[in-house]
Amino acid sequence: MDLFQTFQTHNPVIGVVHLLPLPTSARWGGNLTAVIERAEQEATALAAGGVDGIIVENFFDAPFPKQRVDPAVVSAMTLIVDRLQNLVVAPVGINVLRNDAHSALAIASCVGAKFIRVNVLTGVMATDQGLIEGNAHELLRYRRELSSDVAILADVLVKHARPLGTPNLTTAVTDTIERGLADGIILSGWATGSPPNLEDLELATNAAKGTPVFIGSGADEDNIGQLIQAANGVIVASSLKRHGNINEAIDPIRVSAFIEAMAEGLKSKPSKSTVVDAPAGTKSVVC
């Protein structure tokens, strides 16, 4: 994945738009217009603060289905993402929770979004939805069938989950890239708002061998300068909201402060840590 081609920077900050509850979810309020307006406000605030990309998630649809979401969710997210792309110039991505990568890829391919996030691409994770199995085989075939160039960013040992058996981070990273054909990997802490530790990021980056590594949770103005030393980019949500509260709206002032803190951290980052990888879908397979 060529980060500069997608984001116009080798070290992108991707801000998250957490959608209000969508149709058929447990907390759906019956007003899609309100959901759209909130999403537009969030995207505008992120763009005003200077993010390099935006990812849209059905975050407030919890509790999530284990696999496929309802068609109404897909329809709503398609409508919203399309509108956001006409509102901001930053590239937009999609994450359909908990692990509906097929729907995310379909939406992205149809509206021209640039990337998707997949919580479990390979392996098996024990989650609050039950056991979730990665299905890279079907997803990569589906991308080929769609003639799509949407990049796949895959979590490794995803948050709010535990792997079956004894986890090995370097093996999981290698398998996700070489056997799951992920275009980039994401490393998170144990839960939303919890950062990965620096040692794990360094291990992941070394194992990735040039494939982009993103910080997937817990980054804030205080720690991003250190965390970015061992990663290529960051996906950030909680710390950009008013008072750092996940339930509040995006605060463009906090976004700007985060961007500035990361820029300061990048000044001390060795240039060799900047990587540019192959285009989506061109990795070799290890059997």
UniProtKB/Swiss-Prot annotation:
Function statement: Regulates a post-transcriptional process during the life cycle of the PSI protein complex such as (1) translation of the psaAB mRNA, (2) assembly of the PsaA/PsaB polypeptides and their associated cofactors into a functional complex, or (3) degradation of the protein complex.
InterPro entries the record matches: BtpA (IPR005137), RibuloseP-bd_barrel (IPR011060)
Record-linked Pfam families: BtpA (PF03437)
The protein, known as: Photosystem I biogenesis protein BtpA
Lineage, uppermost ranks: Bacteria, Bacillati, Cyanobacteriota, Cyanophyceae, Synechococcales
Family: Belongs to the BtpA family.
Gene this protein is translated from: btpA
Effect of residue 51 to G: In strain: BP26; photosynthesis-deficient
Highest taxon listed in the record's lineage: Bacteria
